[in-house]
Design a protein with these regions (language model features):
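Junction motif at the cytosolic side of a transmembrane helix
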Residues: 15, 21, 213-228, 368-387
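Cytoplasmic juxtamembrane interface segments
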Residues: 119-137, 212, 292-314
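Loop-to-transmembrane-helix entry motif
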Residues: 17, 21-28, 201, 242-248, ...
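Extracytoplasmic/periplasmic domains immediately adjacent to an N-terminal transmembrane anchor
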Residues: 1-189
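Hydrophobic alpha-helical transmembrane segments of multi-pass membrane transport proteins
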Residues: 40, 180-262
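Alpha-helical membrane-protein architecture signal
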Residues: 7, 11-15, 191, 232-245, ...
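Membrane-spanning alpha-helical segments of multipass transporters and channels
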Residues: 42, 63, 249, 260, ...
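Short helix-terminus and kink motifs of transmembrane alpha helices
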Residues: 105, 140, 208-216, 289-297, ...
Length: 387
C-alpha cells in the first residue's frame, strides 16, 4: 500500500505537470515557436549551405593589367560573378541598395603602382551582411584571388629584397599544399553550424519551459498543490522525478524532430550512429532538466526566464568548443564549459553526428554529463525540499 501511495503521488505530479504545460499558451508558444519554427527557420536560412555566382559590381580606378587580372580571376571563382562595372563607388552603392548586386569591389588608382614599388596593394570589398552566406562567399573568393595574385607577382618582387633575402628565396623549396575537408566536405556554413545550433535550441527551450512553469507556480502559489503529499525528502525526490520525466518525454519527441528529421530534409551531415545519439541524449536531457529545476528558485514569474536565457546562444556555441577550440580557451572559460550541459552535449553531438565518432571518443563529455545530472539532481531535490 505504501508503494502504491508513492506511485499515486508520482502519477499526480506527472499529470499536473502535463496539465500546466498544455494549458499555458505562453509555454506552448515557446515549444511550438522555439522547436518547430526556430528549428525550421535556421535550417531554411542556411539550406543553400554554400552560395555561388554572387553578383558583384566593380569600381576600377586603376585601369591596369593587374587590376584586370584581379577582376578576371575573381569572376572565375565559383562564389562570385562580375555583373557590371560602375563609374564610381556611389553608383555601385546605389546598385547594392536596389539589390542588383550583393558586393562591391573597389580598386584604387595606385593599385598596380604600389605592387611595382614593392608596397602592399590595397583593395576594398564591400558585401551585404543581411545574408551572411553572401558575405562569407565573397570574402573567401577575394582571399583566394589575393593569394593567386601574390604567387604570380612574387618573383618580380625579388628586386626589392636585400642580398641575403634574395639568397633565402632562391634556396627555398616551394611546398604545394592541398587541403581536404575531412568532415564538412562542402565547407558550407550550414553544415558546420546547424548540428550545434539544434542542440542549443533543445537546451534553451527546455530551460525556458521549466522556468516559465516553475515561475508561474511561484507567482500563483501553485506549489502548494503538493502540500498534501508531505514535506519529506521522499516527496521532493518524487516531485523532481515526476517533473523531469515529463520534460524528458516531451523533448525526446522534439529531439527526434530536430536531430533526426530536419537533417534528413535539409541534407545536413548526419553520419552518426542513432543508438549512440540516443545514449547521449539521455544524460543531456536529464542534466538540463535538473539544472532548470535547481535554478527554479530564482524564477519568480513566467517572463523572467525568457529574458535570462534567450541571449545565451552565441556564448554557448563558443563554450562548446565547436566554434573556438577548447585548447585555446583560458582556464576560466574551460571551467564554465564543464558547468553547462549544453556545452558538453553540443561538442559530443557534433563528434557523433558530423564526425562519425564512437562512444569511446566522447567518453569525457558523456561521463561529465552524468556527473552534472547527479549534481543538479541533488541540488534540485534540496530546492524543492525548501519550497
Amino acid at each position: 500500500m505504501k508503494t502504491l501511495s508513492k506511485l499515486q503521488q508520482l502519477s499526480f505530479i506527472i499529470r499536473r505537470e502535463f496539465l500546466a504545460i498544455s494549458t499555458s499558451y505562453a509555454v506552448l508558444l515557446v515549444l511550438m515557436g522555439g522547436i518547430f519554427v526556430y528549428g525550421l527557420l535556421y535550417n531554411y536560412m542556411y539550406a543553400p549551405n554554400i552560395v555561388t555566382d554572387v553578383p558583384v559590381a566593380v569600381v576600377d580606378n586603376s585601369h591596369s593589367e593587374l587590376s584586370r587580372d584581379f577582376i578576371r580571376w575573381l569572376d572565375a571563382t565559383p562564389q562570385a560573378e562580375i555583373s557590371s562595372q560602375a563609374m564610381d563607388y556611389h553608383e555601385a552603392k546605389e546598385w547594392m541598395k536596389e539589390g542588383k548586386v550583393q558586393g562591391i569591389l573597389y580598386l584604387p588608382h595606385d593599385f598596380e603602382e604600389r605592387v611595382f614599388r614593392g608596397d602592399e596593394a590595397v583593395f576594398s570589398l564591400y558585401a551585404t551582411t543581411d545574408a551572411f552566406l553572401y558575405f562569407e562567399a565573397l570574402q573567401g573568393a577575394s582571399s583566394r584571388v589575393m593569394l593567386a595574385i601574390n604567387d604570380k607577382y612574387r618573383p618580380d618582387e625579388a628586386v626589392f629584397l636585400p642580398p641575403q633575402g634574395l639568397l633565402a628565396v632562391a634556396m627555398a623549396k616551394p611546398i604545394n599544399v592541398e587541403g581536404t575537408a575531412l568532415y564538412n566536405y562542402t565547407e558550407g556554413y550550414g553544415s558546420y553550424l546547424i548540428p550545434a545550433v539544434m542542440m542549443i535550441i533543445i537546451f534553451q527551450t527546455l530551460l525556458m519551459v521549466i522556468g516559465m512553469v516553475t515561475g508561474e507556480e511561484y507567482s500563483s502559489k501553485g506549489i502548494r498543490a503538493y502540500t498534501p503529499l508531505g514535506y519529506g525528502w521522499g516527496v521532493a525526490i518524487r516531485i523532481v522525478a515526476g517533473k523531469t520525466s515529463v520534460y524528458c518525454a516531451l523533448y525526446a519527441i522534439f529531439a527526434f524532430f530536430l536531430l533526426g528529421l530536419l537533417p534528413h530534409f535539409f541534407s545536413i551531415p548526419n553520419i552518426g550512429n542513432g543508438l549512440y545519439i540516443v545514449l547521449l541524449l539521455i544524460p543531456y536531457l536529464m542534466a538540463t532538466s535538473f539544472l532548470g529545476l535547481a535554478a527554479s528558485r530564482y524564477f519568480t514569474d513566467s517572463e523572467a526566464p525568457l529574458l535570462m536565457i534567450a541571449f545565451f546562444s552565441v556564448g554557448l556555441i563558443f563554450l562548446s568548443g565547436v566554434s573556438y577550440p577548447m585548447e585555446l580557451m583560458p582556464w576560466y572559460w574551460k571551467v564554465v564549459h564543464y558547468i553547462f550541459p549544453a556545452a558538453l552535449g553540443t561538442l559530443a553531438f557534433v563528434k557523433l553526428n558530423s564526425m562519425g565518432a564512437s562512444m569511446a571518443d566522447i567518453r569525457p563529455e558523456y561521463i561529465t554529463l552524468w556527473i552534472q545530472a547527479l549534481i543538479y539532481f541533488t541540488i534540485s531535490i534540496w530546492v524543492y525540499k525548501k519550497k
